[in-house]
Curated annotation (Swiss-Prot):
The active site is at 128 (nucleophile). It catalyses: L-methionyl-[protein] + [thioredoxin]-disulfide + H2O = L-methionyl-(R)-S-oxide-[protein] + [thioredoxin]-dithiol. Binds 1 zinc ion per subunit. The zinc ion is important for the structural integrity of the protein. It comes from the Bacteria. The keyword DNA repair does not apply. PANTHER family: METHIONINE SULFOXIDE REDUCTASE, METHIONINE-R-SULFOXIDE REDUCTASE B1. GO terms for molecular function: peptide-methionine (R)-S-oxide reductase activity; zinc ion binding. This is Peptide methionine sulfoxide reductase MsrB. The gene is msrB. Pfam families: SelR (PF01641). GO terms for cellular component: cytoplasm. Zn(2+) binds at residues 55, 58, 104, 107. GO terms for biological process: protein repair; response to oxidative stress. InterPro entries: Met_Sox_Rdtase_MsrB, Met_Sox_Rdtase_MsrB_dom, Mss4-like_sf.
């Protein structure tokens, strides 16, 4: 469900001073001010290890490695979140475009955007996510 306003209250309330201490400048700008890291520079763009991608702000599990695919766009791409409850979608009118912004549904951190040009044999969606908004927890591959 997309929200048009920025008035949603998230369960995890962030302390700005603590976030500035804990996050890198890029992580802070991406998650708190909807900045975008440069294409092909993110830590997880080409990661293929098995595991879970979590919100860098509140550690909510967001995406599984099994949903990750190489889109060629320069940012980590996933065809679905871990489940329908972990992300919040908001209409974004910035930069003269209309897009759907993706946020962590627990803390409201900006993650990236979702587009309808993902793998047609999956969901048809491409969650284009900034590496700076994520932490990766590796897990052994299932046999």
């Amino acid at each position: 469900m997309s929200h048009d306003s920025d008035d949603k209250t998230y369960p995890y309330q962030k302390d700005d001073a603590e976030l500035r201490r804990r996050l890198t400048p890029m992580q802070y700008e991406v998650t708190q001010h909807a900045a975008t890291e440069r294409a092909f520079t993110g830590e997880y763009t080409d990661t293929e290890d098995a595991g879970i991608y979590k919100c860098v702000v509140c550690s909510t599990p967001l995406f599984e490695s099994g949903a990750k695919f190489h889109s060629g766009c320069g940012w980590p791409s996933y065809f679905k979140p871990l489940n329908g409850e972990v992300i919040d979608e908001k209409i974004d009118h910035m930069h003269g475009m209309v897009r759907v912004e993706v946020r962590c549904n627990h803390c409201g951190a900006h993650l990236g955007h979702v587009f309808e040009d993902g793998p047609r044999d999956k969901t048809g969606l491409r969650y284009c996510i900034n590496s700076a908004a994520l932490n990766f927890e590796s897990r052994p591959e299932k046999e």
